[in-house]
Amino acid sequence: MGRRNRRNRQRHQRSTEQRSPAEEEQRRKAREQAAWECGYPEIIKENKLFEHYYQELKIVPDGEWDKFMASLREPLPATIRITGYKSHAKEILHCLKEKYFKELQDIEVDGQKIEAPQPLSWYPEELAWHTNLSRKIIRKSPELEKFHQFLVNETESGNISRQEAVSMIPPVLLKVQPHHKILDMCAAPGSKTAQIIEMLHADMNVPFPEGFVIANDVDNKRCYLLVHQAKRLNSPCIMVVNHDASSIPRLLVENNGSREVLYYDRILCDVPCSGDGTLRKNIDVWKKWTTLNSLQLHGLQIRIATRGVEQLAEGGRMVYSTCSLNPVEDEAVIASLLDKSEGSLELADVASEIPGLKWMPGITQWKVMTKEGHWYEKWEDIPTSRHTQIRPTMFPPKDEEKLKSMNLNRCMRILPHHQNTGGFFVAVLIKKAPMPWNKRQPKLQRRPPVSACDASIAVAPELVKAVTENSAGMADEPAVDTENGETKPCTNQSDSSKTDIVCCPPPSKKMKLFGFKEDPFVFVSEDDPIFDPIQTFYALDPSFPKKNLLTRTQEGKKRQLYMVSKELRNVLLHNSEKMKVINTGIKVLCRNNDGEQYGCAYRLAQEGIYTLYPFINARIVTVSIEDIKVLLTQENPFLSKFSKETQKQANNFDMGSIVLKYEPDPQEPETLQCPIVLCGWRGKTSIRSFVPKNERLHYLRMMGVEVFKEKAEVLEKKPVEGKACDEEHIDEKMDIDGAKEESKELSGNESGDDEDPKEEDVIDRGVLEHVALKNTSAIPASVEDQAEDASVSKESVD
């Protein structure tokens, strides 16, 4: 067999060498054509069972069925949302309106004139827009290449999110305030989580809101998509965890020296669903849809929602949502919750909270259909053989008075043809009292105060002894005396570990129960010797919360320092055995060996500069708008290229990390009217910025700099043989370095012995020297990455 294969390869090689380049090209085209003709068949957008089912349930108003089905067969329009809490939101909105949207009006794609994008009437402050273009058209059409580049870069820098319109509804109905403690139970890939973070940071002048978001997902791999989404917003108030939402552990926090159960003010319960509301973008659903999907998910949806209301604080609000139109997944779940809550829950009337949104009220009567098409109107009609498949909670309550008191008409069902969206269901629940099975709330457990030094280590779950969790999620609660409701103190701890379990050093062997490999989250003690040089070098304010800094290594040099809010620190310290934490904290300082000789081994990180800047009182250089352009378009500009005032300020500082601050001038409204804070490095004769490529492009756009270059020009630009094009090499190296850095942070694998590379290696290599200023034709435009859209918008599909 081996000799035969070798002979075949040799014959193929000889025949290839004998063919001319023209013949080779002809054969290649023939192969491509054959592959195209043998491709996947086009999916027919029809499903008779689907139509029969929903026509029978009458969820669509009379006379609208044809419009409903026609809209389902049309591609879903693209929708974008501007990050509202960032100071640059107004500038981005202005840029979109005055530049990109106006240019779109004069373009035709495949003979179809593009309609001007319109704001979503129900989303506040015109921060969400939709167009009649699908995402596929935007991605593939050469005429829209410039607009696509803008979306990709701004999405990566966290200033824009591409998210389905109906997916934006649940966070709006949560009514998040900066002091709220929020749980997102099924968060990945994270577009709704990002929206919640925006609301949490409504006041940009407050670097640490009192509230926080714990974002959970059962899929470990999807958790990293969630981390990627959250990292774009650079918040110290987000924690990503990996648990089954139906048994997510109940957490403890310290309050005035006592330990108490953490109850959330807001919970988003966007459960896994059959997804038949997503037919417009997930066309596979057309051929795969059956009622069996809903019947199988119903029990899981009830368990997740039940666990959610258990952890909701009294007076708190939980939003339940699905991207399914099926009442078995929608009204049936809500009715089941209301029934067993015995008055502890009530459906909120939120019609006035989201004006401009068209929706249909929830239904009060429905039937259940099997995948074979058999209908059942009540549980008593179900054959015994189907009792494991069809449950009593899938039917509406039989008691008319009870059914009326539930107010199921307050549920909201969004139909695709009403506002050119996907299908969606949402309901808002208010918790008025403890759940009947949780009437006896545990009392506070007193314990001695813990010093900052002692309580300095919060390790990841694989480094501590496993705590067995009950499958229903109740075994993780504090031990409660059933007679008096008091929590039982832990008695199996040694005297040296009674103060707090997270004070104990981790065991030598890692726990293998959960199968993930996250590095520990180690809080740095306030008397750590690394703080004095940092405090002196940057003249940090005395109010700087040193105890909120953590690192991801137990031993060796601390390579990167991350910061979390005080409230998240509290959660981490008291729940390290219960939580499978994937990621938390924002990077604020990075180790740089060359910095030691200049007085501080840590440089500032651009990712966390807006969090750290309010505490910095030294090494700040105020720059002009022209200085910012120089910093972002040149790799390592000499001091002589900056304004005289900037040169004067820079000469007052020794070499090392600095802050570059631009303050807008209200007297010049035509210039950029939002502040910019950049991390930089003061060299011997130069200043360079530590800004990722996408952020550079963002700032340049806001300043009116053209950063677009067509793909064709990039592809036609071939390097000289044996020598790569300098510009392409720089972009490629920057992308590789950035990918390595992000991969390390997402995986949490950080070696304490590794140190930052030298200054010239850690700085982003996106030189952008070829960027052209607006109305300046002498300078060629910058080469921008043409990568496909890497962002993942969760449009409520699991």
UniProtKB/Swiss-Prot annotation:
Binding site for S-adenosyl-L-methionine: C186, A187, A188, P189, G190, S191, K192, D217, D244, D270
Superkingdom of the source species: Eukaryota
Pfam family for this entry, one: PUA_NSUN2
Gene Ontology CC: one annotated term: nucleolus
Catalyzed reactions per annotation: cytidine(48) in tRNA + S-adenosyl-L-methionine = 5-methylcytidine(48) in tRNA + S-adenosyl-L-homocysteine + H(+); cytidine(49) in tRNA + S-adenosyl-L-methionine = 5-methylcytidine(49) in tRNA + S-adenosyl-L-homocysteine + H(+); cytidine(50) in tRNA + S-adenosyl-L-methionine = 5-methylcytidine(50) in tRNA + S-adenosyl-L-homocysteine + H(+); cytidine(34) in tRNA precursor + S-adenosyl-L-methionine = 5-methylcytidine(34) in tRNA precursor + S-adenosyl-L-homocysteine + H(+)
Biased composition (Basic residues): 1-13
Region (Disordered): 1-30, 476-499, 723-798
Main subcellular localisation: nucleus
Family listed: Belongs to the class I-like SAM-binding methyltransferase superfamily. RsmB/NOP family. TRM4 subfamily.
Annotated protein name in UniProt: RNA cytosine-C(5)-methyltransferase NSUN2
Organism of provenance: Xenopus tropicalis (Western clawed frog)
